[in-house]
From Swiss-Prot:
Topology with respect to the bilayer: Peripheral membrane protein
Alphabetical UniProt keywords: Cytoplasm, DNA damage, DNA repair, Endosome, Lysosome, Membrane, Protein transport, Transport
Taxonomic lineage from the root: Eukaryota, Metazoa, Chordata, Craniata, Vertebrata
Assembly, per entry: Probably part of the adaptor protein complex 5 (AP-5) a tetramer composed of AP5B1, AP5M1, AP5S1 and AP5Z1. Interacts with ZFYVE26 and SPG11.
Annotated gene: AP5S1
Name this polypeptide is given: AP-5 complex subunit sigma-1
Intracellular or extracellular location(s): Cytoplasm, Cytosol; Late endosome membrane; Lysosome membrane
GO biological process: double-strand break repair via homologous recombination; endosomal transport; protein transport; vesicle-mediated transport
Keyword Transport found: yes
One cellular-component annotation, GO: nucleoplasm
Statement: the UniProt record of this protein carries the keyword DNA damage: yes
InterPro entries: AP-5_subunit_s1 (IPR029392)
């Protein structure tokens, strides 16, 4: 099961950019409770805990992405927004997976699958035993759909104004955090359904 999906900023490697990694969008599937914690579980406290956990994942993804780009020896990709007509080569984008130990930051061990596309990072937080190939394929599909339908890399794109469209894509392609085995024909059908509900 997927526990969270997030989109966050990526800073350019080899720069002295002191800006912080920012979570632009996150969706948590199911809540995590700590049975050993004697403090009351209020809605506000749970929300802050989830926010801290998601930010910790985003920072680690950003760090992994920067390390991978530096280690590859390739020149850093231009992180400036592109025109909406340009296709982004997802097969060349930095990607990876890593494990999170229990209590760091989640109660249970988790696996994170991530993909860095220019100035944006996309990540899925999964159960530790989840199918990584299926998760990577799902993340690539979600990323492609979000980039195509929402034009996320175009200048002046605001994710805050498009949260309902992101949720529409997640509802169809990652329902309740469940990874789906999808063939191309089924994906095309879901894309047509989404396009009819949310015209570009």
């Amino acid at each position: 099961m997927v526990h969270a999906f997030l989109i966050h900023t990526l800073r350019a490697p080899n720069t002295e950019d002191t800006g912080l990694c920012r979570v632009l969008y996150s969706c948590v599937f199911g809540a995590e409770k700590s049975p050993d914690d004697p403090r009351p579980h209020g809605a506000e406290r749970d929300r802050l805990l989830r926010k801290e956990q998601i930010l910790a994942v985003a920072r680690q993804v950003e760090s992994m992405c920067r390390l991978q780009q530096q280690a590859s020896g390739r020149p850093p990709m231009d992180l400036q927004p592109q025109s909406s007509d340009e296709q982004v080569p997802l097969h060349e984008a930095p990607r990876g997976a890593f494990r999170l130990a229990a209590e760091n930051p989640f109660q249970e061990p988790r696996t994170v699958v991530w993909l860095g596309v220019l100035s944006l990072g996309f990540a899925l937080v999964l159960d530790a035993h989840e199918n990584l190939l299926l998760a990577e394929g799902t993340l690539r599909l979600l990323t492609r759909l979000l980039l195509d339908h929402l034009r996320l890399l175009a200048p002046s794109t605001s994710l805050l104004l498009r949260a309902d469209r992101i949720e529409g894509i997640l509802t169809r392609f990652l329902p309740h955090g469940q990874l789906l085995f999808l063939n191309d024909q089924f994906v095309q059908g879901l894309e047509k359904e989404f396009s009819a509900a949310w015209p570009r």
